[in-house]
């Protein structure tokens, strides 16, 4: 029963977030009523507004190839059944969990004649975990296959398992409207400050069973790096290092964009950058002797059940031996390395009709380059440049009612470099009562609007204050 519960938890966690667009909500792009559209294209500014304040807002992204219906269903009125076999069939060779947070801290913008200026700050966290199919199989079947036949050697982990980055961003931008050409151009500079980073380069775990079943041996190897405020000490324990909070681990990025009002058509390229240069509190961690070997020859049942009761001391000893065996035992200082921020590409167009309706089309591409090394004095393999291009096309339809309520529905057609996904609905609500206070809620890249069938979602909500917003019931930007 315990094995089934553990396997069920792993199946639930096995995600494959489309892992894409984790800092973006594409429906914002063609609203023109929200300051957040300018975050995607520096040539965009809220329609009819002369000044705005962007108050703290929150965005969250999560993804999985498994919906609740893939592994759980109800039987009768009160019985919940977990179907692991059905869930296992839905998993691939590598299954990635993605979780992201995009917290808008504060922003403002104002117009001066044909120019406008913007400022924005935010906090971004991205977490990706890869769980190989072999690990889930091993938890469910142990050292046997699905038919119960013994497997002498089981590979349960192989490759990159974890990467996580948290950074702050401060951005300053400007735009200019060229009246004779009906063209607005914009640019933005960003300062990136890295707070914490952890990357696994290679993780291997192999379980070998002796021919006579007298012993099980686990051979483990790992190699990962940490940087920023959350580092490792010489004993391999995590330790906060706040003295490096305001020094090093930084980078710059640039956005450019343009909008042709007669179409209207627009394009933008965001995060042109080498990424974040991690150069403070960096540690490379690997087993001290090159690898770890753990042997288990069984446990005497009379020791475990001493006097008819479960002996917790025996179990605790086994647990401590396991923890001590896999604990990082070699920590080496690394000079520095770079971690790239994905570069985004946008090409959008919209058609406005009857003054209150808008149909929009947006192409969004994203180039992920991952981790790479500028220099490495200790010759530890930090990683190679791995370019991955993901893309999607979002079709949306919006209506502006009463000059203060905008409703948007859309769908994204997504390609992640390996497969194409045609069903990713989205929705948006923008309320601007009294044309001053604005509340927005956006959700897209949702695999289903029905909760038990949804595998992915991207939600963002927040508040803005607009001054000079008249609008006259129009959706189009004047």
PLM feature spans:
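Bacterial Sec-dependent N-terminal signal peptides
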Residues: 1-24, 349, 478
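Hydrophobic positions within alpha-helical membrane elements
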Residues: 7-8, 46, 276
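Hydrophobic alpha-helical membrane-insertion segments
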Residues: 11-12, 50, 280
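N-terminal, post-signal peptide beta-strand-biased segments of exported outer-membrane/organellar beta-barrel
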Residues: 19-129
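Outer-membrane beta-barrel porins/channels
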Residues: 135-478
